[in-house]
Regions:
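Glycine-rich anion-binding surface patch
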Residues: 1-110
Length: 110
């Protein structure tokens, strides 16, 4: 359960840094108001699962030039190292690392 809570917290913080607002947890997922320019969302949308889904994390990694270095027991994304055993799978460990490094980049730029 702790990993799920960490993932939700990471996605929420990243969404805030990317300009989302009015973010709320609904049944283990996050919904909120996307950044300006997302008029088709009618004011509310599902926050992408950057910390757990490649469909969301992949484009994020490309947009923020995150180099991914997979390994046998640990992997890193943009220099943020993760231990696979702390996550449900190697994939979720790496997507979590992508979210964390992008959060760090955005927070540092503020």
């Amino acid at each position: 359960m702790k990993n799920q809570e960490n993932k939700i917290a990471a996605n929420k913080r990243l969404a805030e840094l990317l300009g989302w607002s009015h973010i709320a947890e609904v049944g283990g997922a996050l919904v909120g108001t996307p950044p300006a320019g997302a008029a088709a969302s009618r004011g509310q949308a599902l926050v992408p699962d950057w910390a757990g889904d490649w469909a969301a994390a992949g484009p994020l990694a490309v947009a923020y030039d995150v180099a991914i270095e997979p390994g046998a027991r640990t992997s890193s994304a943009g220099g943020y190292m993760v231990h696979h055993y702390l996550h449900a799978s190697k994939n979720t460990a790496i997507t979590f690392a992508i979210a964390m490094v992008v959060m760090h980049k955005l927070a540092s730029a503020q």
